Regions:
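Short, surface-exposed patches at the edges or C-terminal ends of soluble domains, predominantly
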Residues: 1-242
Length: 242
């Protein structure tokens, strides 16, 4: 039987909806080809029934309890959580995302990253990078991502050690606040097998950008996660999120 990864696309914090045909119909339509089932979820508790949880431009800050719920999901239950922001702290998006991200040792900077040299179609805000360190292989373990385009992205500040680079800008990428162009990063929970991924932009997988370079493959690779079996008090393994 072909493995299926169940993805909860949250709308619990007024995120961009994946069912918005104009913006996200491609990722929703193509997901099954990559073994992904994407559901829009409006119940906080229900989110944690899935393998991967996506917060795509949340507009409501996370409460302390919600942060602890997400920490438990990643560190104990082995879930994958993806949090995506935007450049320049538009609508205080960096501040909002950081109410959750700093629990995993990262923060979004309130800056903008541009690249006058490595970009799409001469637009410096459509930052192109070949420095894709993670999620560059498909389920067959073959490389299917060589470059991505990340439009309107901010950078990420690491505040704890052991953060993994997912995508960094090229040497020509610049921050208007002179920050290092770390654009997408991972926190890995080695015991549970969980992940927390933070991205400086939420539009690299919209209907326009997902057609650029290898963005489609990168998006699908990043969404994929298989929740590891967890041990119960009786010593029997169970699989969450299936």
């Amino acid at each position: 039987m072909k493995k299926i990864c169940r993805v909860a696309w949250s709308i619990t914090h007024q995120e961009f909806t994946v069912t918005d045909y104009y913006y996200f119909s491609i990722i929703e339509k193509r997901a099954p080809e990559f073994g992904l089932q994407i559901d829009e979820v409006d119940s906080w508790d229900k989110l944690f029934e899935y393998d991967t949880i996506v917060f795509n431009y949340p507009e409501i800050p996370f409460t302390e309890k919600e942060v602890q719920d997400v920490v438990k999901a990643v560190e104990e239950l082995g879930k994958k959580v993806i949090l995506l922001g935007y450049y320049k702290n538009e609508d205080h998006i960096a501040d909002t995302c950081n109410t959750l991200a700093r629990a995993f040792g990262m923060e979004l900077n309130p800056d903008e990253i541009t690249d006058e040299v490595s970009n799409h179609d001469g637009d410096k805000y459509f930052v192109k990078s070949t420095k894709v360190r993670r999620y560059n292989k498909g389920l067959d373990n073959k490389v299917n991502v060589n470059a991505v385009v990340l439009p309107c992205t901010c950078s990420i500040k690491t505040i704890m050690p052991d953060i993994k680079i997912v995508v960094a800008g090229e040497e020509t990428a610049k921050s208007n606040m002179e920050n290092y162009p770390l654009l997408i990063a991972d926190h890995i929970a080695p015991v549970s097998g969980g992940y927390f991924t933070l991205a400086g932009t939420c539009v690299f997988w919209d209907n326009y950008a997902i057609r650029l370079e290898d963005n489609l493959n990168f998006a699908m690779n990043m969404l994929w996660h298989e929740t590891p079996p967890q041990d119960t008090p009786t010593g029997k393994a169970v699989r969450f999120g299936l």
